Amino acid sequence: MSQVFSNLFQMTQRLEAQGQKTLDSPFVWDDGSDHDDVTKIHVRGDSRGINCIRFDYIKSGQRKYKSFYGPSWAGFTQTFKINHKEDEQLESVEGFYKPDSRTIVGLQFKTNLRISELIGHGKKDDTKFSLAVDGKKIIGFHGCSGSYLESLGAYFTCIAPTRMEAKGAKGGTDWNDGADHEGVAKIYVRGGRDCIQYIKFDYVKDRKYIYGPAHGVRGRGFTESFEINHLDNEYMVSVEGYYDEGDSGIIQGIQFRTNIKTSELIGYNNGKKFSLAANGKKIIGFHGYADQNLNSLGAYFTTSPFIKLESRESTGDLWDDGTFEGVRKVCIHKQPVLYSVIQFEYVNRGEVENRDLGLRVFIAEEGEFVVNYPYEFIISVEGTFTNEKDPHVASLTFKTSKGRTSSTFGTPGTKKFVLQSKGCGVVGFHGVLSNDYISGLGAYFRLLPPLPDGEKVEAKGGDGGASWDDGGFDCIRKIYIGHGEMGIAFVKFLYDKDNKFVVGDDHGSKTLLGVDEFELEHPDEYLISVEGSYDVVDGSESEVILMLRFKTNMRTSQVFGLDTTSSFILEKECHKIVGFHGKIGKMLHQIGVHVLPIID
């Protein structure tokens, strides 16, 4: 394998063309480096190689169209679009060329967000090459094209990190730890009576700790820390918190999430909720405002790397689907002994894309495994190989981020393999075909993204009282209902998040009439709907909730409050309730829910 890789960080860097060295050829071409980004790549080829290529660029917001290099013969045509408006940038190119003719036969393009499928082919005797510079993006190409593409090189420039603006108030001193780090190593938080007093971050760069300053002022309260093990490929991926919606705007509570674990909420869940997260990226620095307390917090993000794993027992022709946002379905077809076809259903920018491989004769469908993307990812693939001279994949089993395991497809062999990367999910598959059978299987992994927020179902009831919102969790564990003379006076909910109890706030006031409870049988039972009624009562200018009744996948609760006819139902088909919101005064005026899709 020929590899060109550099860690130099000059503004523009030229990597020499890989393939046939023909500098004196009349077919040498050079697009130069006077571009901001690559926006589209056109590739034409046939079974003998890539015969024609063209690159479109962006400069100062305008597209620049270059010429096709090479003849336009019959064969396949493929394009790869790069969406610079979504901060997508071309980072590297891998390819294959014939060692005798030096003709380039296959190309694969990698951006900071995804990897293209292999365009063309890569056989076991072909030479592999790579054009990549750590921390840089491609802004131009050069090469040589005769009857086929004979060589390809690239120009690189530095990638700027993504800055997410600070959430909270902008009073006090503007502080900035910068983005010149590889990751966050440790976080120290000092909490006071009503807010976060100060915060401090330690970072890592070149395997060395960088100790950051404290932002804010130390006072009476509690100190907590959260450590990230970068040696175990652990990265900070998001921050959630709350800030005061009043004049102060200061941070009330904060919670950190890595690709492996989530911290406890440090502080209080009071005020307006905020989130610092970017899909497929990790946090490498923080900034914000601080005075006597932490007033606001923002972050710098950079792309997290794809992790490419593979297991093979024999040689053959390479296949590579590239990467997508997630996997939705895997379908298995087989002949009596060996796998003949595997079909993958991926999601890319909201669209479903299908890929399949293998021999399409005498096949029968064995089964399928459906993944509830974007709330669920495949996190590991376990398999075995056949006991033969030229082994092939004999069985496959898939596990997901929600703890589900598929049935075992196929008949297990004796030699096992596992594709898994801690804290990451599968976003694409690749492998090896030998005599039209799958002799090797690999997967692309990427950091598990923050789960999408649950859908908020509008509250029902009157307009009186003050708003409250517990937010969304994984499920409901227990419900407390306090009675008043004319309806519901108090509610409180016990939630579950990452298999840990989360106690919700008290909403309303308990009365002498007492508090009833409704407990769910976790983890098998979950809440699917809430029925209730509301009306104006004596002493209240707006409607109050008179009655509530809860329905799960297993049973229906007793009536809480007055035994009246139901006037509303809070539910969404194929969803479960994972949180509550509403309005409360002396009585409960409104109640609404947060829901998430039910995973079978």
From Swiss-Prot:
TM spans (from-to): none
Keyword Repeat found: yes
Keywords: Lectin, Repeat
InterPro entries: Jacalin-like_lectin_dom, Jacalin-like_lectin_dom_plant, Jacalin-like_lectin_dom_sf
Molecular function terms from GO: carbohydrate binding
Residues of the Jacalin-type lectin domain: 12-158, 161-303, 304-447, 454-597
Similarity annotation: Belongs to the jacalin lectin family.
Protein name according to UniProt: Jacalin-related lectin 18
Organism listed in the record: Arabidopsis thaliana (Mouse-ear cress)
Lineage: Eukaryota, Viridiplantae, Streptophyta, Embryophyta, Tracheophyta
Protein's gene: JAL18
